[in-house]
């Protein structure tokens, strides 16, 4: 009975990835998305003597990061990282889209923001949305989405980033970053 009740829980669809949803199992994700370019297991540092913060060691948390290169997203190509919880359920998606200039970065930011807003409003269980400015210079957007029948909001951040150290690789200097996650 409990198993069937868990299977009937509606999942929250990710924006820009219509075949993916939060809490999706690792197996289902791999069936839809295929093999990752790289899989990384999260490690954290702890101390054997916590009182004095001595004798550090690393341990695996069980969280997994699936990295994909050359992901096509609304006419743009970038790289994506999907984060899975300790119970191996999808909890976050991050996409980096490289652009060639600051001007192109602003154009892509505006286009993606409008596309994301339309996709949010088209979700079948869409209820409401608020938009805040985010980013170092308040030059990005945070869409806080409330869905019917859900207690937790999910947020989508769309903002420009700049790598100051990327002098040689000009096409990697400017990017647009899109994060999707649920607020607890």
Say what each PLM segment does:
Residues 20-43, 105-127:
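Amphipathic alpha-helical segments
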Residues 7-9:
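Bacterial signal peptide processing site
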Residues 64-72, 95, 143-147:
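Short beta-strand segments that buttress and anchor functional surface loops
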Residues 3-5:
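C-terminal motif of bacterial Sec signal peptides marking the signal peptidase cleavage site
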Residues 139-184:
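An acidic-aromatic pocket/loop used at catalytic or ligand-binding sites
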Residues 37-71:
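N-terminal, post-signal-peptide region of Sec/Tat-exported proteins
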Residues 13-19:
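Short, recurring structural edge motifs at helix starts
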Residues 70-138:
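Long, charged/polar, surface-exposed segments that mediate recognition or autoinhibition
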């Amino acid at each position: 009975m409990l198993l069937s009740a868990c299977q009937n829980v509606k999942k929250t669809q990710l924006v820009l990835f219509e075949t993916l949803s939060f809490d999706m199992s690792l197996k289902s994700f791999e069936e839809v998305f295929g093999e990752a370019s790289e899989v990384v297991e999260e490690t954290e540092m702890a101390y054997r003597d916590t009182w004095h913060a001595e004798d550090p060691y690393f341990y695996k948390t069980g969280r997994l990061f699936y990295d994909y290169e050359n992901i096509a997203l609304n006419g743009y190509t970038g790289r994506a990282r999907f984060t899975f919880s300790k119970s191996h359920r999808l909890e976050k998606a991050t996409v980096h889209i490289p652009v060639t200039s600051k001007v192109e970065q602003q154009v892509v930011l505006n286009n993606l923001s409008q596309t994301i807003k339309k996709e949010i409003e088209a979700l079948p269980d869409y209820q409401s949305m608020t938009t805040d400015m985010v980013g170092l210079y308040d030059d990005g957007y945070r869409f806080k989405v409330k869905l019917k029948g859900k207690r937790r909001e999910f947020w989508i951040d769309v903002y420009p980033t700049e790598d100051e150290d990327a002098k040689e690789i000009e096409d990697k200097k400017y990017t647009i970053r899109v994060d999707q996650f649920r607020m607890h």
